[in-house]
C-alpha cells in the first residue's frame, strides 16, 4: 500500500504531480522539505506482523479483566454433570449393554399374546 498526497490542480486545469514544480523548485529532492510518501515493503510488513502478539499485552489495551465463569463451580462433577441425548437414540444404550453383557430390558412392557389391538 502506498500513501501519498492528493493531486493538486494547476491554473491550467491539469493535474500536477509535484507541488514543488509549480513553485519553481528544482526537480531533485529538496533536503529542507521531506518527502511525505511512505512505501510499505514486504520486509516492513513481515517485521510489523512478527512483532504482533496473540496475548493481551499491547500498551493500548486495558489491563486484563477477570470474566465471571460461564458455569458455577461443580461440587461433584459425577453427580451434577448431565449430558442430554436425544431420547430416540438407543445406540449408546445398546453399546453399554453389549459391553456389560446384560440382556436388554424393554422400555415398554410386552403386551400379553391375547391383547391385540383391533383397527
From Swiss-Prot:
Short sequence motif Nuclear export signal: positions: 91-100
UniProt cross-references to Pfam families, sorted A to Z: HPIP
InterPro entries (alphabetical): HCFC1R1 (IPR029195)
UniProt-annotated stretches for the region Disordered: 1-34
Subcellular location: Cytoplasm; Nucleus
Job description of the protein: Regulates HCFC1 activity by modulating its subcellular localization. Overexpression of HCFC1R1 leads to accumulation of HCFC1 in the cytoplasm. HCFC1R1-mediated export may provide the pool of cytoplasmic HCFC1 required for import of virion-derived VP16 into the nucleus.
Protein name in UniProt: Host cell factor C1 regulator 1
Organism: Bos taurus
Amino acid at each position: 500500500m502506498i500513501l501519498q498526497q492528493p493531486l493538486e490542480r494547476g491554473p491550467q486545469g491539469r493535474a500536477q504531480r509535484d507541488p514543488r514544480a509549480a513553485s519553481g523548485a528544482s526537480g531533485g529532492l529538496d533536503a529542507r522539505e521531506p518527502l511525505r510518501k511512505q512505501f510499505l515493503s514486504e520486509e516492513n510488513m513481515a517485521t510489523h506482523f512478527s512483532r504482533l502478539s496473540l496475548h493481551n499485552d499491547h500498551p493500548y489495551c486495558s489491563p486484563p479483566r477477570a470474566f465471571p465463569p460461564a458455569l458455577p463451580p461443580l461440587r461433584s462433577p459425577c453427580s451434577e454433570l448431565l449430558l442430554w441425548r436425544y431420547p430416540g437414540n438407543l445406540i449408546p444404550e445398546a453399546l453399554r449393554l453389549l459391553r456389560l453383557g446384560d440382556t436388554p430390558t424393554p422400555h415398554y412392557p410386552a403386551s400379553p399374546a391375547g391383547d391385540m389391538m383391533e383397527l
